[in-house]
Amino acid sequence: MVRTPLSPEQVAAGRRLGAALRAARGARTLEDVARGAGISPETLRKIETGRLPSPAFGTIVGLSDVLDLPLETLAEVWRPVSAAAS
């Protein structure tokens, strides 16, 4: 299956998502949060740094659960800045 390249807006959204997840992680270790979400620490590292700007929905659900962040909050972070402002 061929993936369509992400638009610059989607890449920027991925960076915002990663930054929000990193902030929510706080003092918790990357390893502990990754384990709780059922993903590898490397996957979480890539998401937090924006190198994986479009993670799987199940990954986001797991991170939402372990970080006690509502999915709606993460969706707001992901939405384009112009859409969030309207």
Language model features: what each stretch is:
Residues 51-56, 82-85:
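Short, solvent-exposed alpha-helical "recognition" segments
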Residues 1-27, 72:
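A short, Lys/Arg-rich alpha-helix, primarily the initiator
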Residues 22, 31-32, 61:
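Residues within the helices of the helix-turn-helix
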Residues 26-46:
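Short alpha-helical DNA-recognition segment
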Residues 2-3, 75-86:
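Short, charged recognition helix plus adjacent turn
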Residues 27-29, 55-58:
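Residue-level signal for the short linker/turn that defines the boundary of a DNA-recognition helix
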Residues 19, 23, 46, 65, ...:
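DNA-binding alpha-helical recognition surfaces that contact promoter or target DNA
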Residues 58-74:
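DNA major-groove recognition helix of helix-turn-helix/homeodomain DNA-binding modules
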